[in-house]
């Protein structure tokens, strides 16, 4: 049984931890508001760009003027998987959900005899995936020093992906990230970037993608410029969604930790009081016994 001093020290330690988790919850809540605003602001632009891309792709079809980023290589032998997670932990199961979702996809591809290459955006996803797929990871994007995610961060990743595609390094590229729904709900999501699937995008964007436009210059030339930018835009949106999801998960995790610390303090305080009461009672009995002996 721990002594009164041990219990007192443990209560003080848990109280100190509770102060830290409470402060982290408040910081995450403040960051969440800004991250949520950024993610929600990026959605209409990325969705509209996807709709315009789908419209132009339908106009071009599969003729010779269609860029390879849209039509693909005609094969699906080699897959590039981009996994976006957080750089830090203490956010519940946020990172593990994305990593598990991507891991299942990679295993499915490997079971089908496909070649898989992985780019990890974020330290936590890298740490989790390298346990099983160390030989498949070809690059890791480090964003630890980035205080605020900007389009330039996504654009660098997009250029890297297009460079690999132009070199014939892969046939299909899929982006994995967590779509922010609410503080307690972040949905692991997979989005195909290359080849740009006009049919899927059109279905996702609804009737807005079926409007009729006239293009100047011709549609194929517009697609050649629009698809690379769309890749960067979709990656940018994924990064913003991830930041919002991470902050939401962190706020929820720190709230749970703060409440758990409070419950532990109550239990330890009860144990301390009971033991102190027992010790006082014992001392009183000894005093009374001594007095009676006299």
UniProtKB/Swiss-Prot annotation:
It is a peripheral membrane protein. PROSITE patterns: ATPASE_GAMMA. GO terms for biological process: proton motive force-driven plasma membrane ATP synthesis. CDD domains: F1-ATPase_gamma. The keyword Ion transport applies. GO terms for molecular function: ATP binding; proton-transporting ATP synthase activity, rotational mechanism. InterPro entries: ATP_synth_F1_ATPase_gsu, ATP_synth_F1_gsu, ATP_synth_F1_gsu_CS. One of its GO terms (cellular component) is plasma membrane. It is found in: Cell inner membrane. Pfam families: ATP-synt. F-type ATPases have 2 components, CF(1) - the catalytic core - and CF(0) - the membrane proton channel. CF(1) has five subunits: alpha(3), beta(3), gamma(1), delta(1), epsilon(1). CF(0) has three main subunits: a, b and c. Produces ATP from ADP in the presence of a proton gradient across the membrane. The gamma chain is believed to be important in regulating ATPase activity and the flow of protons through the CF(0) complex. Belongs to the ATPase gamma chain family. This is ATP synthase gamma chain. It comes from Rhizobium meliloti (strain 1021) (Ensifer meliloti). The lineage of its organism: Bacteria, Pseudomonadati, Pseudomonadota, Alphaproteobacteria, Hyphomicrobiales.
């Amino acid at each position: 049984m721990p002594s009164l001093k041990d219990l007192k020290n443990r209560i003080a330690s848990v109280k100190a931890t509770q102060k830290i988790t409470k402060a982290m919850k408040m910081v995450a809540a403040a960051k969440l508001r800004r991250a949520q605003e950024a993610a929600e602001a990026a959605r209409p632009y990325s969705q509209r760009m996807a709709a315009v891309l789908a419209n132009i792709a339908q106009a071009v079809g599969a003729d010779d003027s269609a860029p390879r980023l849209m039509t693909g290589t005609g094969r699906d032998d080699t897959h590039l998987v981009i996994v976006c997670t957080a750089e830090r932990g203490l956010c519940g199961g946020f990172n593990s959900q994305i990593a598990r979702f991507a891991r299942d996809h990679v295993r499915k591809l490997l079971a089908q005899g496909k070649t898989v290459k992985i780019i990890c955006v974020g330290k936590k996803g890298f740490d989790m995936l390298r346990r099983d797929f160390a030989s498949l990871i070809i690059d890791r994007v480090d964003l630890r020093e980035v205080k605020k995610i900007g389009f330039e961060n996504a654009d660098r990743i997009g250029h890297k992906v297009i460079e690999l595609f132009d070199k014939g390094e892969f046939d299909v590229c899929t982006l994995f990230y967590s779509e922010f729904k609410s503080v307690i709900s972040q949905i692991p999501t997979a989005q195909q970037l290359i080849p740009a699937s006009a049919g899927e995008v059109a279905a996702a964007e609804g009737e807005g993608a079926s409007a009729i436009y006239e293009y100047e210059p011709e549609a194929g030339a517009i697609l050649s410029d629009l698809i690379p930018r769309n890749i960067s835009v979709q990656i940018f949106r994924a990064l913003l969604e991830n930041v919002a999801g991470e902050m939401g998960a962190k706020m929820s995790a720190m709230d749970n930790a703060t409440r758990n610390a409070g419950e532990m303090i109550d239990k330890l305080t009860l144990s301390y009081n009971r033991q102190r009461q027992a010790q006082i009672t014992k001392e009183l009995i000894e005093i009374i016994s001594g007095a009676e002996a006299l």
